[in-house]
Amino acid sequence: MGAVITSGMEISRKSIRIVFFVALAGALSLPFLNAQNAPAAAPPAASNWLSMLSARLGGTNAGAWTPEQLAAMARIRDASMSDPYALNQLRYLTFNIGPRLSGSPQAASAVEYVAAQMRALGADVTLEKAKVPHWVRGVETAQLVEWPNQTPGTTQKVVLTALGGSVATPADGITADVVVVDNFAQLAALPADAVRGKILLFNHKFDKELAAQGEGGQAYGGGVVYRGAGPIVAAQAGAVAVLVRSVGGADYRIPHTGMTAYSDKVTKIPAAAVTAEDADMLKYLAAQGPVKLHLTLTPQSFPDADSYNVIADRKGTEHPEQVVVVSGHLDSWDLGTGAIDDGAGVVVSMQAIELLHQLNIHPKRTVRFIAWMSEEEGSEGAAQYMIDHKGDAANHIGAIESDLGSDHPTGIYYAGKPALGDWLRPVAGVLDGIGAETLEASPETGEDIAGLTEMGVPSFAPVQDSRFYFNYHHTPADTFDKVDPKHLNENAAVMAVLAYALADSGEVAPR
C-alpha cells in the first residue's frame, strides 16, 4: 500500500502534560475549594527495489532524493531487519544495568555505557550536564484495618506504589478513613469537610476498550490528570493522603507509578497509585460503610543530582554543522527495568548510528544521537539541551524521538508544516516494505524534542501499535521479555531510514 496521510490521533507526552496542567488549573477553581500485532510484509529484494518504488509512488517525483539515495534507504531498512544490535543493547541495559531512575547509580552507569558504545562506532561523543531530581522510593505498604463485615482480627493487603516525587508518611504510617470518588466533579459535590483528615481515592478507570482500538494515548490522557493533580486537589480538600487508581491496563494486580505534582500553596501529602483490583475493592467496601486504611510510604527526596544527556554525532560530509536528532530517553522508572519505556527508544536510535557505520553510509549532514536524561521526572535533560543549544535551532534540520514502546510501527508522525506529508512520501514508499508507510500529522511528536518542535524544527516519531503498551507502562512488568525482536528491528528501520533521509536529502525538510 502506498503512503497514506491522516491526522494523528495519539496524544503525545507533551500533549498529555498540557492536558494535565489544564486539568490542574481547572481543579484549583472547583467550587468546593473556594468554599496482538499486525504482521509486516517481507521487504522486497534489492534487485527490484527501484522499479517497485516507482510503481508505489505512482510516478510521483522523488523530489528530495535521487534513485541512489532511495536505494540506500532500502539497504538500511533491510539491514535493520536482521541486525541484532538493538536487541543486544537492550538486553544489556535491562539485565546488566537495570532500572535507571534519574539521579541513581544505575542511571550514571547507563550514561557511561551508552557513551562507550557510541564511541566504539566512531561517533563524536559529548556528555552534556543537567541537574536532575534524585528521589528514592523506599518502603510502600498498605492494609485495610477496618471495613464492613470484617472477620475479627484480620487485615487485608492493599497493593500500591508511591507516585514519583511523593512525600513520606510519618514513620509509623497514617491510619485514616477512605473516601472514594471517581472524578473531580464528585469530589466537588461532597459536603464541606467530607474529606478532611481522611485518605482520598480518585477511582478514574483507564478506558481499556479505547486502548484496544489502538488509542492507548487517549485512554492514558483521560486518567493521568488525577495522578498529576490529585495531591494538590486532595490536600486543598483537607485529605491527609491521596490514592489514585493506576493509569494503565494491567490486570494482574500490578500498580502503575508515574510523576505527580505539588504546590507550595497547599500541604504536600503522601501520594500512591493502587491497582485497579484494589481500587474496585475499596469502592465496593466504602459503599457499605466506613473503611479505614493504614498507609506507610518512606520515599526520600535528595538535592538535585548531576547527570548527563549522551550526545553522539556522526559527522556530515558536506554540512556537519546541520544536525538531525535521533533519540530516546535513557532514564526509566524503578519498578521494572525500563525496557519499553524507554530503553527501546534509546536502542533503536543507537541502531540508526550503528547501521550507518556498518553500511559505510555517510550523509551530508550530521546525524546526532541523543539519550535524554530525566524525561520521567520533568524532562530536565531536554530543558537543558534547549538552553545549551538555544541559538542553534536553525541548524537543527529535523528531530526524531521514539517513546511509545517497541510494538509494530505503522508509519511516521510529523509535526510542522503541512507540506511535510507530501515531502515524506518517497520515504514512506521505502517503509511500505515493513508495513510502516502511513504518514500522520500531529501537533507534537515527543516530550524531549517538544522544545525543538516549538522553535519550528520539523519533528517526527514512529507511529506505533499502542494497544498493549499501557499494560506494562510504569509497572514492574516493563521488562525485556515484553519486546518482540522483529518489531524492535522494524522500529529501528523507521528511525534509521528517516534519519538518513533527513540528513542526506537534496533539499531540507520544509519548515
Residue ranges and their predicted role:
Residues 88, 354-380:
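Short helix-loop-beta-strand segments that form the rim/entrance of peptidase-like active sites
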Residues 73-80, 95-105, 180, 213-231, ...:
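Second-shell loop/turn segments in exported
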Residues 354, 358, 470-511:
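His/Asp/Glu-rich mid-to-C-terminal helical/loop segments that flank catalytic regions of hydrolases
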Residues 19-31:
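Bacterial N-terminal signal peptides
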Residues 45-69, 91, 95-212:
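Noncatalytic luminal/extracellular "stalk/propeptide" segments of secretory-pathway proteins
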Residues 81, 119, 171, 176, ...:
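Metal-dependent peptidase/peptidase-like ectodomains
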Residues 72, 147, 159-192, 260-339, ...:
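Soluble metallo-hydrolase cores and metallopeptidase-like ectodomains found primarily
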Residues 63-104, 254-259, 331, 403-407, ...:
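N-terminal capping segment at the start of a domain
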